Swiss-Prot record:
Catalytic site positions: 67, 115
Signal peptide: 1-20
Cross-referenced Pfam families: Phospholip_A2_1
MF terms in GO: calcium ion binding; calcium-dependent phospholipase A2 activity; phospholipid binding; signaling receptor binding
Lineage per the UniProt record: Eukaryota, Metazoa, Chordata, Craniata, Vertebrata
Gene Ontology biological process terms from the UniProt entry: arachidonate secretion; lipid catabolic process; phosphatidylcholine metabolic process; phosphatidylglycerol metabolic process
Keyword set, alphabetical order: Calcium, Disulfide bond, Glycoprotein, Hydrolase, Lipid degradation, Lipid metabolism, Metal-binding, Secreted, Signal
The UniProt record lists the keyword Metal-binding: yes
Glycosylation: residue positions: 92
Subcellular location: Secreted
Keyword field contains Calcium: yes
Full protein name: Group IIC secretory phospholipase A2
Gene name of this polypeptide: Pla2g2c
Example of a GO cellular component annotation carried by this entry: extracellular region
């Protein structure tokens, strides 16, 4: 019974950190662009969402490619940007990144900076967002197999 309790606490903590990072990015996208990250950007083009590859289809997709590259660089430094939680504030449309207490603080702050650049890029390219590039279940056959290097 004690083993199950320890396991459940571990799963809760891992899930909370994963979801918190996920939700932080979602909230940032919503505040800055006015759009839902999931319904507007997940599955957009060749790089928005999981498993990016090919040539970005437009400026919005290039935002996602740059975000992937930013996260990739953090991983090279030993960070886990999807898991490293962070704090942010938005005042007059300006995002300010901070970090939560505990391990991964610097990595969390750097992940926030990646997310911040991405949402500003999304906002800058709202006028050229093309709904036909958004797929609910992205298979991305038009993207090819090769991944664009950072």
């Amino acid at each position: 019974m004690k083993g199950i309790a320890v396991f459940l606490v571990f799963i809760f903590c891992w899930t909370t950190s994963t979801l918190s990072s996920f939700w932080q990015f979602q909230r940032m996208v919503k505040h800055i662009t006015g759009r839902s990250a999931f319904f507007s950007y997940y599955g957009y083009g060749c790089y928005c969402g999981l498993g990016g590859r090919g040539i970005p289809v437009d400026a919005t997709d290039r935002c996602c490619w740059a975000h992937d590259c930013c996260y990739h660089k953090l991983k090279e430094y030993g960070c886990q940007p999807i898991l490293n939680a962070y704090q942010f504030a938005i005042v007059n449309g300006t995002v300010t990144c901070g970090c939560t207490m505990g391990g991964g603080c610097l990595c969390g702050q750097k992940a926030c900076e990646c997310d911040k650049l991405s949402v500003y890029c999304f906002k800058e390219n709202l006028a050229t967002y093309e709904k036909t590039f958004k797929q609910l279940f992205p298979t991305r056959p038009q993207c090819g197999r090769d991944k664009l290097h950072c």
